[in-house]
Amino acid sequence: MPLFLAYLGALAVLLLLPASAGNLVKAGLPVGLRLLPAMALVFFVGLVDDIRGLKPWQKLACQLLAAGLAFWAGVDIKNVDGIVIPAWLGLPVTLFWLVGCANAFNLIDGVDGLATGAGLFATVTILIGALLSNNVPLALATIPLAGALLGFLRYNFNPASIFLGDSGSLTIGFLLGCFGVLWSQKGATILGMTAPLLA
């Protein structure tokens, strides 16, 4: 919950910046805002699972729906390291990738600071890659996540006083999967797409 609220708060701060900040900052908002419905669905599914527990098929169904929302918002795997993915295959490949990233981070959440630290490393990697490729919207969309993870890591590091839970770890993995795909769309490199898992 704290991580999700921190990310939303950072997006809100960007919205409230004075006009003197210019269109440079505003350009990054569409990425974060387009992904907000999908991210919120993943978060609330994880939250319900933390509180009440969900059956695996229920979680999978909701995660696939969230991945579909992200695909509709523009997160579409069109190529992998220069290999063009046929249009008819783009949706299932994207769904598989995003659900896989979300659950991969969920699996490593058992050790204090591991998922948060890996998430921060992957976020910074994508941020640097976006800056080097002049992908300003993606760079600005990753900054709120990097800030939220950095602030959370202080309390999640050993000995942890707060934990990500399913709501946090699933959301981090899902967002990083989305950001990796968006990076690869510009650079056509496998590094961008696999950054979340390489962390």
Where would I find each of the regions flagged by the language model?
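PRPP/pyrophosphate-binding module of the type I phosphoribosyltransferase fold
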Residues: 102-103, 112-116
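Extended, hydrophobic alpha-helical segments in both membrane/secreted and soluble proteins
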Residues: 101-104, 124
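Hydrophobic alpha-helical transmembrane segments
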Residues: 60-76
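Alpha-helical transmembrane segments
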Residues: 3-44, 94, 114-199
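Transmembrane alpha-helix boundary signature
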Residues: 10-25, 43-54, 71-84
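Membrane-helix interfacial "entry" motifs
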Residues: 23-27, 31, 51-56, 83, ...
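Hydrophobic alpha-helical transmembrane segments of multi-pass inner membrane proteins, especially
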Residues: 37-41, 45-48, 67-70, 94-101
